[in-house]
Amino acid sequence: MSSSPSLNTWSDALSGLSIGWFPLGLVIIAAIPLVFIALYALTYGVYGERKISAFMQDRLGPMEVGIWGLLQTLADILKLLQKEDIVPKLADKFLFVIGPGILFVGSFLAFAVLPFGPAFIGADLNVGLFYAVGIVAIEVVGILAAGWGSNNKWALYGAVRSVAQIVSYEIPASIALLCAAMLAGTLSMQQITMMQAGPGGFMHWFLFTNPIAWLPFLIYFISSLAETNRAPFDIPEAESELVAGYFTEYSGMKFAVIFLAEYGRMFMVSAIISIAFLGGWTSPLPNIGGLELNTMTSGPVWGAFWIIMKGFFFIFVQMWLRWTLPRLRVDQLMYLCWKVLTPFSLIAFVLTAIWVINH
């Protein structure tokens, strides 16, 4: 399915304005709404996790600040702003300061290629999927900088664990996403989404048009849990062993930035799996006879709604698993990656290639 001529990026739309600004400024302006939306959503992701954990443990959770505790996250931000920003005496101050910044930037750079609708995308790169996967390498640098710069053995152990885990699970995750790229015949995330659009709604999604797609779908979801250090793969932050992992020595807003970067990664991988296998911003509702549900629930605003809801669904599953599954051991973690997920991802790759050739 070819892309529609109306698929304009935000930067393209803004470049038509006769304001005489440098194009880079237009790109920055185009990114501002996306950044604010992401920050707002991720900030309340913290509130959502607190409420979900409270439900799992049969308690109320935040209730004091605002109605139903809705302003609790804002209160936490104000509290962190007032906390002392402590830098350990023997720490490498440059690495200690730049580590959280690299993590934050790395988490949000991938948002530039995530299509939030037919026209809501920062940059429709023809290698967008490759870019989104490769951007994880920047986060690895930030984690190492934070762990090494802290001059704390627990922080360093946590950083080494995290880097080994991310690099290892990046292999099955990348191969799983290549299966979706083969089905679509492109690495453009916008084009992958368009290939799954149609009046049949969810029946056009790769997960329902190709029985083999369930295998790379599950492989990527499991790998994404490891890449974001979420339970049961939260070994780099094991409280009973490493205090808090690579951010043990951080306080104040530096701690808040690292925390926010983690939720940014959670939404990023959730959006990627939604785009690769579940139609991204396309509506799940099909047209049934004269009832054109798909047509009525499609368009720019609906597109943003659908991909955000799909992303939030997978974030909910990640939070749910945190309070359901126990933490794996290091040997179990690596065994799962190298002897289970990687071989099965290669099998999925071969089966997908055979499917594409024969269809």
UniProtKB/Swiss-Prot annotation:
Biological process (GO), any one: aerobic respiration
Superkingdom: Bacteria
EC number: 7.1.1.-
PROSITE patterns from the UniProt entry: COMPLEX1_ND1_1, COMPLEX1_ND1_2
One function term, GO molecular function aspect: NADH dehydrogenase activity
Transmembrane domains' residue ranges: 19-39, 94-114, 127-147, 166-186, 202-222, 266-286, 301-321, 337-357
Catalytic activity of the protein: a quinone + NADH + 5 H(+)(in) = a quinol + NAD(+) + 4 H(+)(out)
Mode of membrane association: Multi-pass membrane protein
Keyword tags: Cell inner membrane, Cell membrane, Membrane, NAD, Quinone, Translocase, Transmembrane, Transmembrane helix, Ubiquinone
GO cellular component: plasma membrane
Subcellular localization, as worded in the UniProt entry: Cell inner membrane
Enzyme class, first EC level, given as a word: translocase
Primary role: NDH-1 shuttles electrons from NADH, via FMN and iron-sulfur (Fe-S) centers, to quinones in the respiratory chain. The immediate electron acceptor for the enzyme in this species is believed to be ubiquinone. Couples the redox reaction to proton translocation (for every two electrons transferred, four hydrogen ions are translocated across the cytoplasmic membrane), and thus conserves the redox energy in a proton gradient. This subunit may bind ubiquinone.
Subunit structure: NDH-1 is composed of 14 different subunits. Subunits NuoA, H, J, K, L, M, N constitute the membrane sector of the complex.
Family: Belongs to the complex I subunit 1 family.
UniProt protein name: NADH-quinone oxidoreductase subunit H
